[in-house]
Amino acid sequence: MKKNILKTMIFGVIGCLFTSCFSDLDTMPLDDNQLVGEKVYQTADGYTGVLAKCYSSLILTGQKGGDGGDGDLEGANEGYSSYVRLMFYLQELPTDNFIMPSSSNGLRKCLNLQWDESNASVIRWTYQRLYMSIAYCNEMLRECTESKLKSRGLWDQLGGECASYRAEARFIRAYCYSMLCDLFGNVPYIDENTGVKDIPEQWTRKQIFDFAESELKAIDADLKAPGTNVYGRIDKVAAWFLLSRMYLNAETWIGENRYNDALTYAKMVINDGHYPLASDYRTIFLADNDKCKEIIRPLVQDGLKAQSSAGTNFYVKAFVNGPMNELYNTGVGSRGWGNVRSKTTLVNAFDADDVTFDTNDTWGNQKKDKRAQFMTALPNQKKETWDDKDNMTSTFTCGYGYIKWRNVNQDNTIPAQGDAYSSIDFPLFRTAEAYLIAAEAILRGAQGTKEEALGYVNEIRERAYMSGKYAKDGIRSDVSGDITADQLNLDFILDERQRELASELVRRTDLIRFGKFTSGRNWDWKNGVRDGSDVEDHFKLFPIPATEFSNMPNLKQNDGYTK
């Protein structure tokens, strides 16, 4: 029911308002003297629609749905241009998780860690997508003020929600800046006070980090209490989670040890209790995952009202091919694209006995670790991502499929929205990661005991193995998954994050934090060779897109790249 409320808000209001009105904001100048799109703000629904656009900008691609030809990003392939799909290309493809052999739009450059400032369109589109989301949030903050609401006669209707609307827009903006900090380092800063003719100042990575941190702390009082907002919108816990993730990476990003803070905020997420671990890992990635209380920050999808070749539609269809639907219910029929397979390093992170797909046990109920969701049963399928001549190949059977994303409900039925597009909400933040953040922070020196860290890790592993309190009838639970204190170290945490969070847009960040992205660990096709080889350290950051320098000639490029 909650899910339907937000979807009605997003897709109904956006459909009515933004197709006709919000596009004006993309083409007309925004300044303090001329209220473009003024008709948007004449009703309370208009304001709700602008906030909805802030949210949906991270999962949808345009105004019409599907690949309707009215995408948000001018010149971008609409199917590619969803934030979630773009982030897969930047955060998963260059790592030890997945292979996608396509050469279009710079994907091969991302896979091989051989990009530059102009040879990978997906890098430019990611940069633009994040700034577009920031622009939507800035627009909301300009217009959702007490004085403007009163001047439009809307204060009585919206005054009680004004503070929370603003806080949510500031959260989304802070999240976008945190990702720009992660991906690009020193980037231009714009806010609601930046004029249309102003040339944005390029801030240092620390300035961007400090801004996002200060915003997340400042909005705490105005965000909804944990668990009280409608499904799909954020509350205080989302801000705590994002702070914990930022603090975990602070030493890498800005040279500051903030592990105590990472632990503090991760424990706030865990101990609050409104977002408990799901009892079954596999349910987090299904079409009815709006029932899953573990998801703190879902990016809402709907097979009818949020159609796109991006979003989780990509995560289902790109990861399967047509014949796989004959072996298990993919939820998309024979519509699989056959693009993405697992690298050998991801497969090897799991016990070999758990990797094999059993056609008589398609959910993997008899596996020890239920996270080992691979397709190994196609004819002539092999683990290696290369052919018999050691060449990269687009043949889908060279490499195992990864099948944790399924467009079906928990009872294995197709969702009511059908099987043409995915109805899986993307779990951008979920509580299991907070457990792993807490454990890692302790191992890096935060004020906690190793026994405490071990408890966090074993809680995750017991859930994965469905042992102890997670045991269910008919599902294997005789192996606990628990490890000992002697087994727990940072290398184990990195591997456990791979097992738990593969495909969830954090792997590049993890490898960099552990010092194993450019060197220290190799994988299939890193630097363009079969077994991988080291690359230069400047690949820890993506380049500022070359197209940005024509409008901002004083912009400084990241080291190792040219303008």
Where are the regions that the model predicts?
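Bacterial Sec-dependent N-terminal signal peptides
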Residues: 1-31
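An aromatic- and glycine-enriched ligand-binding surface/loop that stacks and positions planar moieties
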Residues: 22-103, 107, 209, 217-218, ...
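Structural register within alpha-helical repeat arrays
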Residues: 166, 173, 243, 250, ...
